[in-house]
Design a protein with these regions (language model features):
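S-adenosylmethionine/decaboxylated-SAM
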Residues: 8, 13-41, 51, 58-219
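N-terminal pre-P-loop "Q-motif" helix
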Residues: 45-49
Length: 219
């Protein structure tokens, strides 16, 4: 069948896209796009990576932590794919819900979307085991106690906050826990990639580069 979208083009099998559970999970992603950020973009392969990682992490001790949950695309797909509300785990979704923290010299590319915190609360008020936490990272991590992590998504579009989160959370990640770095291999994100490479080299880990631009690390 082949696939050409979201920075990749491949003739590899896309059979996973026909899976009924995956279709339902991706439908949840589209429902979450209330501000139109995703629009007509096709991120199915990226979501495939997310739900694969979540499925692995389901059987590892620890909670799910989403640093830069944005509009809730990853979270909503995971909730549907794993029936997360039935699990003995908590999903922590952190975001400013208004874009990048300009203290680090970043341009806020999400400024035109305003503050979407209430949108996320309203869209996901029926989900069990979900904690939606508003604030800039890594500072906001100090407001909660998380003992063990099996799944960590890092998508802050900014070097310093991402490395700050990893410094705080690394020791809490269980053996075999999965880390997804959303921007790792994307064009224009070399500063993030280089910083992540340095961090994970210090932990004797190698980041796997996905054709989607995501990076994957297993602790």
């Amino acid at each position: 069948m082949g696939y050409s979208a979201d920075i990749i083009s491949t003739d590899a099998s896309t059979n996973f896209m026909n899976d009924e559970l995956f279709i339902k999970a991706y439908d949840e992603v589209k429902k979450t796009d209330t501000r139109g950020y995703l629009g007509s973009q096709d991120i199915r392969w990226r979501i495939h990576t997310i739900v694969w990682a979540a499925k692995v992490a389901e059987n590892i001790e620890g909670d799910f932590v989403d640093c830069g949950g944005g509009f809730g695309y990853f979270m909503s797909s995971i909730y549907e794919y794993l029936n997360f509300s039935s699990l003995d785990k908590t999903y922590y979704m952190f975001d400013s819900f208004s874009g990048q923290d300009t203290r680090y010299g970043d341009i806020n590319h999400f400024e035109s979307f305003g503050d979407w915190y209430q949108d996320v609360l309203d869209n996901h008020d029926n989900k069990q085991n979900l904690k939606i936490l508003k604030g800039y990272l890594p500072d906001k991590l100090n407001d909660v106690t998380i003992d063990n992590i099996s799944f960590l998504s890092v998508d802050l579009n900014s070097v310093n906050p991402e490395i700050g989160c990893l410094n705080i959370l690394w020791d809490k990640i269980s053996k075999g826990g999965i880390i997804i770095l959303d921007d790792y291999g994307f064009p224009g994100c070399s500063n993030q990639r280089e910083a992540h490479d340095t961090f994970f080299k210090s932990k004797n880990r190698l980041v796997y580069t996905c054709p989607t631009g995501q990076g994957i690390v297993i602790k």
